[in-house]
């Protein structure tokens, strides 16, 4: 029964964002998901080490980027225009062949802007970079289809769409190379160690 409950919840969450069930990894929330996406990407490629994010991200992203920067991983910050939008042209000016990850939030938690994710994904992929979006403010409120948008990773937190606190997920597109954040057991297909919080996972779905 517990395994079926988790599997059913995984399928429900996947359907909400246009993903496959095996692309959904349960976490403790948006902050863990952001940490995992950013650190897991940086640590996974010894040759492409740089990360680009925006100057108006949530602290979960900004402080994680500061952490990897202190470890010697280059981080560049792209600024929004006067309307609070990260434009494709602004990203194009900063991205290089050394860029491993571009991380831009889906919608801003303070000013409410919705970023042109599909355009930004296209720029990232043109240069061989992965694209992650912190969609904590968007999931459950804005229609999202990760396949249509081309997103590689997406973070979400249940309490932002009327679910319980302390649970969330990271969408990781099949084939994306990422290192685990935690060492330990084989939960979440060996990528996220730690006993699953079944009650909250079910509550999220």
Label every PLM stretch briefly:
Residues 1-205:
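Pyridoxal 5′-phosphate
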């Amino acid at each position: 029964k517990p395994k079926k409950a988790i599997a059913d919840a995984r399928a429900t969450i996947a359907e909400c964002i246009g993903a496959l069930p095996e692309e959904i990894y349960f976490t403790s929330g948006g902050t863990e998901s952001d940490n995992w996406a950013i650190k897991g990407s940086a640590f996974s490629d010894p040759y492409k080490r740089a990360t680009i994010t925006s100057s108006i991200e949530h602290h979960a992203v900004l402080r994680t980027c500061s952490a990897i920067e202190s470890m010697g991983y280059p981080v560049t910050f792209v600024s929004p225009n006067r309307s609070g939008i990260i434009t494709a042209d602004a990203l194009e000016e900063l991205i290089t062949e050394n860029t491993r990850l571009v991380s831009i939030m889906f919608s801003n938690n303070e000013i409410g802007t919705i970023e042109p994710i599909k355009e930004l994904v296209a720029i990232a992929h043109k240069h061989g970079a992965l694209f992650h979006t912190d969609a904590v403010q968007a999931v459950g409120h804005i229609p999202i289809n990760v396949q249509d948008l081309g997103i590689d990773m997406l973070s979400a937190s249940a309490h932002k769409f009327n679910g319980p606190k302390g649970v969330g997920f990271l969408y990781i597109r099949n084939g994306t190379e990422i290192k685990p954040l935690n060492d330990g057991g084989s939960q979440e297909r060996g990528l996220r160690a730690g006993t699953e919080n079944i009650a909250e996972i079910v509550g999220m779905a």
